[in-house]
Amino acid sequence: MAQAWAFLLPVLVFGSYMTSLFFPTYISGPLCGGDGGGRSLFLCAQAPKDQDPSPAVSTMYKTAFHFQPAKNWMNDPSGPMYFNGFYHEFYQYNLNGPIFGDIVWGHSVSTDLVNWIGLEPALVRDTPSDIDGCWTGSVTILPGGKPVIIYTGGDKDQHQAQNIAFPKNRSDPYLREWIKAANNPVLRPDEPGMNSIEFRDPTTGWIGPDGLWRMAVGGELNGYSAALLYKSEDFLNWTKVDHPLYSHNGSNMWECPDFFAVLPGNNAGLDLSAAIPQGAKHALKMSVDSVDKYMIGVYDLQRDAFVPDNVVDDRRLWLRIDYGTFYASKSFFDSNKNRRIIWGWSRETDSPSDDLEKGWAGLHTIPRTIWLADDGKQLLQWPVEEIESLRTNEISHQGIELNKGDLFEIKEVDAFQVVSFSQTCLLGLP
């Protein structure tokens, strides 16, 4: 016997990226049984059958709330940081078109991780050591509040090396201009067993118990994939440690390694160069096989090495940061709110010809807070709280009766904007 249900239906509106087409939202009755407690439900919608299924995405469907430049190609996040009241997001960018090539460091700033100001590129290809591209790297805040970029550059022969740049004027709140070190490149893959075209993506630096800086670089060592470890007194002159931070003989070269401390069950971030609390663990992330994988373990200070809690030889079984289109992620310690934030690159699924037609390609995932689960076995993540500022215009319908098979269309919002809806009461239920 059909039951008539009346319920209050508040709908929260929040823009979200999707490559699909716009379509109306419908709610079909009867609803699943409720407990009167405002249970959250998810909407499922389908595009009309006569809609063109082509993967090409019109400009009107370009993401509105994810981080993305106005046009052209973008890939890896590089060197995110919080400094003097501003969040900085650097990124791999092609000034000349929506396909990979001619890579420089794009640069944008924000006060809230939501609204961004686009600036001129921070680094361009203008020296012999980076003429083939200013590739991925990191930012480290040196003592005295001095940011330094360390990044991979490619020379005319596509050999890779690490380079350094400092802000030209630290009093500029946007840090718009950067000066490359005169002694670039500061690090070359010139030791036995190293591959000069597989040596890139340096991590943020950290200070060890001996007071020396450390940094890891993705590379190959004697055919093994590795996070190569280096030491320095001044962040300018580096010496390779005689063993990697960690290595593995069953995977491809590790791109975009990331290394950071986490405390089980505590979503506060940890600065790797500060005193690490007792009981803390470390995460080693690597980008490999087109996905981002990671291990949880401890940083053995005596051995100066990462030791996984569980050694898994089959890389297919390593933990993953994300099961979607997510690669080349970069995290940073946000001293403003004492948290660790991570970004990833979403390449999307359009073809190069589609990208050329659109005029843009690639975006960064919404920034997420990342921390270690209570059991210390896996990383957890959630969009930063600032994203909720985009949720506006709550829609409320009251006294709507749905009989079995009825449809009620919410016309005020597109399905891709709906965050959730809930009912405060269901009449006719026990």
Locations of regions flagged by a protein language model:
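Entry beta-strands of beta-propeller and related beta-repeat scaffolds
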Residues: 86-89, 145-150, 210-215, 269-272, ...
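Short consensus segments that form the blades of beta-propeller domains
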Residues: 95-101, 154-158, 194-195, 218-221, ...
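N-terminal regions that are enriched for targeting/export leaders
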Residues: 2-94
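Beta-rich accessory regions
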Residues: 2-7, 15, 20-30, 46-52, ...
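Short loop/turn segments immediately following beta-strands, especially the blade-tip
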Residues: 109-113, 165-178, 230-237, 264-265, ...
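Structural motif
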Residues: 100-106, 157-166, 223-229, 290-298, ...
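Surface loop/turn signatures of beta-propeller and other carbohydrate-active proteins
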Residues: 38-78, 97-100, 114-141, 173-206, ...
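Carboxylate/His-rich catalytic cores and anion/metal-binding grooves
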Residues: 146-186
